[in-house]
A protein has these predicted regions:
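Alpha-helix-loop-beta-strand connector modules within alpha/beta enzyme cores
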Residues: 148-172, 214-221, 271-287, 316, ...
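Non-catalytic terminal accessory/regulatory regions of metabolic enzymes
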Residues: 1-106
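N-terminal small/glycine-rich loop or linker at the start of catalytic domains
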Residues: 91-110, 141, 282-295
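N-terminal active-site wall of soluble small-molecule enzyme domains
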Residues: 140-195, 207-209
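Active-site mouth loops of central-metabolism enzymes
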Residues: 103-120, 143-149, 169-174, 199-202, ...
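Catalytic alpha/beta core domains of metabolic enzymes, predominantly
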Residues: 93, 206-325
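Hydrophobic faces of well-ordered beta-strands that scaffold small-molecule active sites
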Residues: 103-109, 131-135, 169-172, 196-200, ...
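Glycine-rich, proline-tolerant flexible connector loops at the mouths of alpha/beta enzymes
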Residues: 134-152, 325-336
Length: 374
């Protein structure tokens, strides 16, 4: 059960203390308080854990300072969609909005290689009106002898270049809690010229200690990628780990499923799960066409497979796209064969816009149909 308080019901407000005191006297009930502190107001939620079936919802709603009470299922307690649950489906970070109702493109380098290529990528993004990117500093690899990323050494100049070209958010994978510390320190030392969305990759989705540590910090949002060898339910529960520790600013990423039936693609494209995740949870949903397809193969119509699956995800309602680009893919240190060219960026963005417009038209059509039927 979630008790949602009226805005700005903080610890110093008498009604806040009275509500907690009232709940403290309920047998077999524990409380956990979560606050979202914004520029305009503070929102407070009290999570009740235990024998909530015995609680009188109307009695709690009658308390001064309570806006409403939501009964929730055991599944996805924090992030799930529950009956009568009108909590928001997104968040804002560093001036960029992430929600189930909009779309952001994160085009960039799968792995940071050198300042020249990073600057070329960032300039192309700025020239095409983009404020988000992906930049890999830490690269978990299947082969121990493969390039593992430049790590903390590249962070200062990557952040400074991002700030120079107006990039507001960089999606950056971490594989260890020390990487979180290194990113926070580099942001501080460079004067925070940009922002970082921490990416937890498919290999670490069940690294529960890492999830807890990342969840306890609420400064940086998180992109959590689906695990390639586990069920969707298990992956969504990993997101609950993050949220239960306090960080609700989570985007859930679909990146294809590992299976021998995906050939000739790298993974089996799972973008049909975009509406499923949005139905089950309040998280925005990201698609990663580059790691789903893994090649630059082209269909007879002249369009790349990556473009086709991107459109599939967008027209299904995706809210974020993580896609690989590189100035010189043949020289990329990681995943060069799947990287798009900088000259393809304007085309890619226009193609995404067409798919998004089609999605919006489908939504409008559905609303008209439902209104007429009702």
């Amino acid at each position: 059960m979630i008790v949602i308080l009226k805005p700005d019901m903080g610890e110093k407000v008498p009604e806040y203390r009275q509500i907690l005191e009232f709940l403290a006297h309920k047998p077999n009930i524990k409380t956990r308080v979560h606050q979202e502190i914004g520029t305009q107001q503070t929102l407070t939620e009290i999570y009740l854990i235990g024998d909530t079936a015995s609680l009188d919802k109307a009695e709690i709603e009658s308390l001064p300072g309570v806006e409403r009470v939501v009964r929730i299922s055991e599944e996805y307690r924090v992030l799930g969609r529950h009956r009568d649950d009108r909590r928001p489906t997104g968040f804002e970070y560093n001036g960029v909005k992430f929600s189930q109702d909009n779309l952001n493109v994160f085009a960039g380098l799968c792995a940071v290689d050198n300042p020249e290529h990073v600057e070329m990528m960032l300039k192309a993004l700025r020239d095409n009106g983009q404020v988000c990117t992906r930049m890999g500093a830490y690269k978990p690899r299947t082969n121990p002898y493969s390039f593992q990323g430049h790590g903390k050494d590249c962070l200062p100049w990557v952040f400074e270049l991002a700030g120079r070209y107006g990039i507001k958010v960089i999606a950056m994978e971490i594989t260890h809690d020390s990487h979180l510390v290194e990113i926070q320190e580099a942001l501080h030392k460079t004067g925070r010229p940009t922002g970082v969305m921490l990416q937890i990759g498919t290999r670490n989705i069940q690294n529960f200690e890492l999830l807890k540590i990342v969840g306890r910090q609420r400064e940086l949002p998180v992109l959590l990628k689906r695990g390639f060898g586990i069920t969707l339910e298990e992956s969504l529960n990993a997101a609950e780990y993050l949220a239960s520790e306090g960080n609700r600013n989570i985007v859930f990423g679909l990146r294809g499923m590992k299976t021998n039936m995906a050939d000739p693609h790298r993974n089996f494209v799972d973008f049909a799960h975009v509406p499923v995740v949005k139905r089950l949870t309040r998280m925005p949903v990201c698609i990663d066409p580059s790691h789903s397809v893994g090649t630059r193969d082209m269909a007879p119509d002249g369009m790349l497979d990556i473009s086709h699956v991107t459109a599939q995800g967008v027209i299904a309602g995706a809210n974020m796209i993580l896609v690989d680009f590189h100035p010189v893919p043949s020289k990329a240190l990681v995943d060069g064969p799947q990287a798009l060219l900088l000259e393809e960026l304007p085309y890619f963005l226009e193609d995404v816009g067409i798919a998004r417009e089609a999605y919006e038209k489908r939504r409008a059509l559905t609303r008209r149909f439902l209104e007429k039927r009702n």
